[in-house]
Amino acid sequence: MKLFYVDESGDTIPLSQGGKKFLVLTGSIIDETNFLPIEKKLRAIKQKYYNDPDIEFKSNFIRNANPDIPDGKSPLKLHDRQKYNELETDLTDFLKSIEVTNISIVIDKAEFWKKYPSQNPYDTAYVFLLERFNLYLQEVGCLGMVIIDPREGRVEKAFVGDHLRDIH
């Protein structure tokens, strides 16, 4: 079975209200047999640098952990440049070692809302993403499971639960 982890970048907020220009929905596909080894390696990195295998890694946290960014706020902040370089190297090597297929859908929200003013770009991106995941599954002859990041950032996800049943 293939696991398809879906997360977004951007938001569904109108540009006139300070929203981002693009909404990007990306899914990363891994084989289920690789899940535990991936988790084990990542937890080891977290333990090595933060003595906490459960600490949350987010790209913003890691980027702002850089001691050369004094205004960068991060629960992962490192004050030693050498240590940060080692973290970057370990994370880069870790990410390069993962067998993954990524699928991304990018929506230019201004153009999208010109054509579909009453539609939610997240819904459209999600449908397109699932279509491509289904094509991938057919191509490799496998079943799959979709895992959506449940945290709400700047994308309204409160409606997603009931709405996804309609999409599937």
For each predicted feature, which ranges?
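Phosphate-ester processing/binding pockets and catalytic centers
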Residues: 1-168
